[in-house]
Amino acid sequence: MQKKIKNREALLSHGDIDGRKIVLDITEKTLQHLDAYERIKSIAHMEGDVLCIGSRRWDLSKKRNVYLLGAGKACNHMAMAVDEILGDHLTRGIAIVKIKEDTDVFRKTDVYVGGHPLPNEEGLRACKEIIKLVDSANEDDLFIVVISGGSSALMSCPIEGITLQDEIDTTDVMLKSGA
């Protein structure tokens, strides 16, 4: 697993070295335990054609399509784990993220960079793609959805009569008033 604290050596170059080591070790373990990618990998896996998530099981050989939908600030990591776990079973994925990272590797998932805290055009485009995908689905399709904090801004899709700019302006007013 990749280390979360990138500047460990610099932090240990001065001050109470022993105390700093203890704090950094605890912090590193905590960050690794909370990592969205690792959390998904710890609860989901494939057994042949069967997807196992916790105690639930889905035989993917009986599904027409398997889709991944995701949004949120931790979506990169969650969606990447699901994409990796499903492998060739995944038909298509759509992930709306705050920042596309250089380390993001997806096989079959389209990644959109939505706006946060203010919605943007790319988030709107992604939502329209999600709606098209959901509308084309039937009972033989399986959707796996991963949502994390920030998804309400990243997944902007105003109703008819409300523009994206209306939503941006409303969100901006709410943020400036402390909401």
Predicted regions and their residues:
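N-terminal loops that bind phosphate or other acidic moieties
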Residues: 1-179
